Amino acid sequence: MAFILTSTAFSQSKDEQIIRTLIEEQRLAWNTGDKEKFMQTYWQNDSLMFIGKSGVTYGWQKTLDNYKKGYPDTAAMGKLDFDLLEVKRLSVMYFFVVGKWHLTRTIGDVGGHFTLLFKKVKNKWVIVADHSS
């Protein structure tokens, strides 16, 4: 019984570390101006949900298109920082992440909060819902 509990605890901490690493990889991709690489953490599916100041967007490509429109160049993109406030396992298949985002830009800094829902799809953790404000 102790082995099973230890194995489960190890698996959970490993999954949490994977989630944290994926978010860090997003930050690094953004900071090099690579929106496509930034989007690799998102579920490449028409059911991806992104909620922002303009409302709800469904779909990976539409979300990428919105990022390209809203952040057309590296000056608009700036340098991204995240402050993860909570990374919580909801089940074997889901993680919930709450944090702050901040863009340091020559055209003026911006920032806000986000919630992410990660789901394990085909043995890979992906963001299936993002609410950023």
What positions do the PLM features span?
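Structural motif
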Residues: Q44, L90-S91, V121
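Surface-exposed, charged secondary-structure patches
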Residues: L64-I107
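A mature extracytoplasmic/lumenal domain signature
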Residues: S54, E86, G99-W101, L116, ...
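A short gly/proline-enriched turn/hairpin at secondary-structure junctions
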Residues: N45-Y58, P72-A75
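Hydrophobic pocket/interface hotspot
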Residues: Q26, F38-M39, S47-L48, T63, ...
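Short, low-complexity N-terminal intrinsically disordered segments enriched in polar/charged residues
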Residues: I4-T41
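Short beta-strand edge/turn micro-motifs at domain boundaries
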Residues: G111-S133
